[in-house]
Structures are given as C-alpha cells and as structure tokens.
C-alpha cells in the first residue's frame, strides 16, 4: 500500500509539473497569437516615458522597438495629441530638490529638473522634448528631461574665440544667442550660431556656424544672413526652420531652413520700426510663429498664417 501511495503521489506531481509546463507553453502561444508585436508596439506608444524605460528590459525585441526613432516619433505625437502641453520648471539654485518633482494640472504635467551642468542659458522652447542649454565659454549640452539622457557638443569657433578673449581678460564682446532645432527631412538635430560680424571684428555682415549632430562637427555656412540681426532677442525654432528679427528701421523676420541651410526673409514686421529692440520678441502660440511688441501697458501680437503671410 505504501509503495502504491508513493507512486501515486509521484505520479500526481509529475502530472502537475507536466500540466504546468503545458499551461506555460499554452499561455505563451496564446499571447503570441493574440498580441503580435505590431499590436504590442501600439500599446507601448500609449505609455509614459517612465514606463517605457522600465519595459526595455522585458525582451530584446521590446528594447529595440522602444529605442527606434520611428517609435519615439509616434509616441511623442500620440502624447501631444492625448493631453495638454507639459511644462518644465528649471531652477539654477543649489536647492534640495535633487530628484525633481511633478504636479498635474488638468491634462498637463509640470515637472522640475536639475540639469547636469552649471550653464544658465537655455535656447527658447524645446524641440521634440529636448532642451538645449549653453554657455559661450564651454560646451553646449542637449538634455532629455524625461529620460535624463544628455549629450555634450564640442566648442564652436565662436566659443573658442570668446574663451580665448576671456582668458586674456578682454570682455568687450556681446553674448550671442544659440538656436536649436531639427532638420525635418533627414531627422538630424542642429545648433546654430548667427551673430553680427562687426562686433567680433569680422568682415561680413553676419557670421553663421552650424553644428550637425550626425557628424558631430561645427562648420561655417556661406553665405550668411545679408541682414544684421536683433541680438537682444532669442531665435525661435518652428517647423524645420530657425527665425530671428533683423535690425534696422524696418524690422524683418529672417528664417534659416535647417535642411537647405539657406536664409530668406519671411515678411516684414510693420509695427517694429525705430523702437527699442528690447521690447520686441518672437514666440510660438498655437503652433504658429508670432512676433510681439510691448508698448507700455499694451502688447501687440502678430502671427504668421499658414500661407506665410502675416496677420494681426
């Protein structure tokens, strides 16, 4: 009886083990049958970045999908369509907020973030979630606050020149404003220095340097802008181009196409004439490039329409 009982127990354990193994195989086959990888990709697109970072360890296939550029572009578009814009609050003080905080306001998320640098200059806005922070004396840094990824760039010729003058205690040079955007045709990010040449004892009207992330190098662009720029204001990136306001009695909106690397005048800003250039600025409102003038208590805003004209 004892032997029969033992054999029956062993047999039942084997049956359970076999059933468990069969169940695992069955579940795996059902998951593969019901959730092909393209469907899994569609589900992953709906997840926040924090979850995607954790799910990269599920499998090599998931990791490859999440790290692919096409997936990241789709996930960004879906996130932008599903809720309001996120707001990033940057503090340069050495406070105790080491890990960042988040607050939810309606469909938007407000986050704090500590950048991995002491630079205090930031390019206007963001480009697909990337922030560019810079200093004229040290390398620029591009940061993704959502993933904590960052990349340092080599010094441009302008930065090397200013750093040399700083070491010699020659401080009588302006601080140009850096532009950051994306070449929408080939998908590469670029940084642009555009500055008035005479302030740096150069011959041309303006000088332009471009950093291409695909080859990790700076180079000059010829010809540069034929118009001097308003160097009080930050350049603004929009839809594959970077924009500046020009100097002069009749201010213009100057555009630099990041793929063709050519300059053109989009339009004139007829109300920005012979006024204090510090009160003029550009911004993005409702995905449109806008020009603003502050005149006492009043503020006048012009926006470019889809045909490239302007309207108030």
Swiss-Prot record:
This is F-box protein At1g11270. It comes from the Eukaryota. Gene3D superfamilies: 1.20.1280.50. It comes from Arabidopsis thaliana (Mouse-ear cress). Transmembrane segments: none annotated. GO terms for biological process: heat acclimation. The lineage of its organism: Eukaryota, Viridiplantae, Streptophyta, Embryophyta, Tracheophyta. InterPro entries: F-box-assoc_dom_typ1, F-box-assoc_interact_dom, F-box-like_dom_sf, F-box_dom, SCF_F-box_component. Residues 29-80 form the F-box domain. It holds the Pfam family FBA_1. PANTHER family: BNACNNG10540D PROTEIN (PTHR31672), F-BOX PROTEIN CPR30-LIKE (PTHR31672:SF13).
């Amino acid at each position: 009886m004892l032997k029969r009982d033992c054999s029956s127990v062993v047999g039942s354990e084997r049956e359970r083990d076999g059933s468990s193994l069969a169940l695992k195989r069955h579940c795996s086959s059902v998951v593969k049958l019901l959730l092909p990888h393209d469907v899994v990709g569609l589900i992953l697109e709906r997840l926040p970045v924090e979850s995607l970072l954790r799910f990269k360890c599920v499998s090599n296939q998931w990791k490859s999908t999440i790290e692919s550029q096409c997936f990241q572009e789709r996930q960004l578009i879906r996130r932008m369509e599903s809720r309001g814009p996120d707001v990033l609050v940057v503090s340069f003080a050495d406070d105790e907020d080491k890990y960042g905080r988040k607050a939810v306001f309606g469909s938007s998320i407000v986050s704090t973030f500590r950048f991995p640098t002491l630079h205090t200059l930031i390019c206007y806005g963001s480009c697909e979630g990337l922030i560019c922070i810079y200093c004229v004396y040290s390398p620029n840094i591009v940061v993704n606050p959502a993933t904590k990824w960052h990349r340092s760039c080599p010094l441009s010729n302008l930065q090397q020149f200013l750093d040399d003058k700083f070491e010699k205690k020659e401080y009588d040079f302006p601080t140009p404003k850096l532009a950051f955007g994306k070449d929408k045709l080939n998908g590469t990010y670029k940084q642009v220095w555009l500055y008035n040449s005479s302030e740096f004892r150069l011959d041309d009207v303006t000088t332009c340097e471009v950093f291409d992330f695909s080859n990790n190098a700076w180079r000059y662009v010829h010809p540069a802008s034929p118009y001097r720029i308003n160097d009080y204001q930050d350049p603004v990136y929009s839809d594959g181009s970077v924009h500046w306001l020009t100097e002069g009695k009749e201010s213009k909106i100057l555009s630099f196409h990041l793929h063709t690397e050519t300059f053109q005048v989009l339009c004139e800003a007829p109300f920005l004439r012979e006024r204090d250039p510090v009160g003029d600025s550009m911004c993005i409102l409702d995905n449109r490039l806008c020009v603003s003038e502050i005149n006492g208590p009043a503020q006048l805003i012009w926006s470019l329409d889809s045909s490239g004209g302007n309207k108030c």
